[in-house]
Each structure stands twice: as structure tokens, then as C-alpha cells.
């Protein structure tokens, strides 16, 4: 398949991260994946439709997907094989979570938001459900 991809990343003043991925293909049966791998210390604590909440010992992470996409959360050995920090191969040492969003078609896009939070302070799920502002959407060219 003749396939092209583009990624735009926006970080706002409060440290929230928005990733917009676009993909174009000549074949409408093309499946495109957006993958994220989390550290072994993170564990899935809540899943509601398009919102995933992970927590570690001190911090947590909210992942929100705003474009209809299949979502698979896997826990275990990661593919592709990745080495961790230094010379340790984390794939052999500890299992991780891998989040995969996927879509099928010839003109696809993903809109994913991330928010790191301190567990002591709790989380604001309302933010997870809010669409990015028109200014952010314009900067991401969506």
C-alpha cells in the first residue's frame, strides 16, 4: 500500500499533551495503529469508553481518545521488542501495558490526549472528556 503518515503534538500550559495522527492510503482496507507503551510500574485501574486511567506508585496517567477507534489494552510482553533504559531488557524483566488504537480506511486520524497527575491530589475526569479547544484544534490542523 502507498501510505503516508503525519504526527502533530501539542503541549498546553498545564502539561497536558495532545497527539494528532493522520494517515492516508490508496487502499481503503488499510488498518492503521496508534500504539503507546507504558512503564512496568503503571497498571490499568479504570476504563470507560474512550478514557483509560493508569496508576503507578506516585503518579497516574489519563489517556483519552476522541476519534472513533478500536481500543485494545494488552498487558504482557511488548511487540516490537524494545530494550529499556541502560542495558536492561525490560521485556525480559517486567510486563508492561500497551495501548493500541486502530482504524481501517483510506483517510484516518486519531486525536489522543494525555494527562499525568499526582495520586495524592486525585484526578479530574471532567478534563478527560473535554474536547481540545478550537485554538488547539487549529494548531493541530484538524
PLM features: residue spans?
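CBM-like, beta-strand-rich accessory domains located in the C-terminal region of large
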Residues: 1-142
Amino acid at each position: 500500500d502507498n501510505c503516508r503518515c503525519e504526527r502533530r503534538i501539542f503541549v498546553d500550559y498545564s502539561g497536558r499533551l495532545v497527539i494528532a495522527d493522520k494517515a492516508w492510503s490508496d487502499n481503503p482496507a488499510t488498518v492503521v495503529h496508534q500504539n503507546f507503551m507504558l512503564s512496568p510500574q503503571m497498571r490499568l485501574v479504570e476504563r470507560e469508553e474512550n478514557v483509560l486511567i493508569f496508576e503507578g506508585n506516585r503518579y497516574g496517567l489519563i489517556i483519552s481518545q476522541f476519534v472513533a477507534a478500536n481500543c485494545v489494552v494488552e498487558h504482557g510482553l511488548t511487540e516490537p521488542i524494545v530494550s529499556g533504559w541502560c542495558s536492561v531488557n525490560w521485556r525480559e524483566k517486567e510486563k508492561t501495558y500497551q495501548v493500541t488504537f486502530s482504524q481501517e480506511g483510506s483517510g484516518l486520524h486519531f486525536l489522543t490526549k494525555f494527562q499525568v497527575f499526582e495520586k495524592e491530589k486525585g484526578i479530574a475526569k471532567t478534563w478527560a472528556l473535554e474536547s481540545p479547544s478550537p485554538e488547539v484544534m487549529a494548531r493541530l490542523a484538524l
